[in-house]
Regions:
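N-terminal pre-domain/capping segments
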Residues: 1-111, 183, 210, 253-254, ...
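Acidic/histidine-rich catalytic cores of soluble enzymes
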Residues: 17, 42-43, 75, 138-236
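Active-site acidic/histidine proton-transfer and metal-coordination neighborhood
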Residues: 21-33, 67, 84-187
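Acidic-and-aromatic substrate-binding clefts and catalytic sites of carbohydrate-active enzymes
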Residues: 22-24, 46-59, 82-86, 122-125, ...
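Short, hinge-like loop/turn segments at secondary-structure boundaries
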Residues: 61-63, 91-93, 132-133, 173-175, ...
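Short, charged alpha-helical segments
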Residues: 233, 242, 254-266
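Catalytic-face loop-and-helix region of soluble metabolic enzyme cores
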Residues: 239
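Short acidic/histidine-rich active-site segments
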Residues: 246-251
């Protein structure tokens, strides 16, 4: 099992020290460097950071990746808020164009997984026919699968708790979508924080080990893992079922360097 951490949107600096504003390029390169320094195997970034890069910056990161100096395993926050999935024909065309450009760019940087969380853009409007909306989400996922096939990536569906969206709130529901669509490049993510919010049993991990390719971890109050009970059982279950993918710390931080290091040490100790 590999351990990873999301590159934070805030400061890399210890509390009390001023950080110079960073470009997307600098945040990505510094983020990957800091994760290695803190004891992680990999890093996870947002798709927004990737899409904010200039063409020259993409070329520089491609060269760094080929040289083994830059590595991201996954990206999250896939779809920006101005591109809802439940939309009209013109909106769908813009959405699908973004999907193709984003997956193409991520693949060119050696990124293997894209996380379909994006709770806001997948929310089904109250006044919308739910069956029709779910059909639109299915069509979107099929389009993502086609782009992943084209560029050599995998999309993992991330169930999110009911406070964040009203479609696919549990790992069991996410697994049902993955199995029903049965697409080559669309698999499942389990997030311990969202599972704890929904009161979901660890059993769902064992039941879906065959399609579970990526995991997120945090405490039940979305702080670093190792501070509440649920995430310990979550990680123990992943070990028991022989999960051999990535576990990424995705949480809020106070002092990033200090807390991310503590989280890495806790993960290493639990996995030993």
């Amino acid at each position: 099992m590999k351990i990873s951490c999301c590159i934070p949107g805030g400061s890399f600096m210890p509390q009390g020290e001023k950080e110079v504003p960073m470009s997307s390029y600098d945040r990505l390169t510094e983020g990957c460097r800091v994760m290695r320094e803190l004891g992680y195997d990999a890093a996870e970034a947002t798709v927004g950071l990737i899409m904010a890069l200039t063409d020259d910056e993409v070329s520089a990161l491609q060269a760094a990746h080929r040289a083994g100096e830059f590595s991201l395993d996954a990206c999250n926050s896939f779809i920006p808020g101005h591109l809802p999935i439940i939309t009209d024909e013109k909106g769908t065309a813009a959405l699908y164009d973004f999907v193709d450009r984003a997956i193409s760019r991520m693949a060119s940087l050696g990124i293997r997984y894209v996380v379909f969380g994006s709770g806001f853009v997948r929310r089904i409007p109250e006044d919308c026919d739910r069956a029709a909306a779910e059909a639109q989400i299915d069509a979107f996922i099929c389009q993502v699968d086609a782009c992943c096939e084209k560029y050599g990536m995998i999309c993992v569906i991330e169930p999110l708790n009911k406070a964040e969206t009203n479609w696919c709130n549990t790992v069991a529901e996410g697994a049902a979508v993955v199995r029903r669509l049965n697409l080559k490049n669309v698999k499942l993510l389990a997030d311990g924080y969202h599972m704890s919010r929904e009161g979901e049993s660890y059993d769902v991990l064992a039941e879906n080990r065959d399609i579970l390719l990526h995991c997120h971890i945090a405490s039940s109050d979305r702080k670093i893992p190792g501070t509440t009970e649920y995430e310990g059982g979550f990680l123990d279950t992943l070990k028991e079922i022989g999960y051999n993918g990535i576990v990424t710390v995705e949480c809020g931080f106070g002092d990033f360097r200090e807390e991310a290091k503590i989280a890495a040490e806790w993960l290493r100790a639990k996995l030993a």
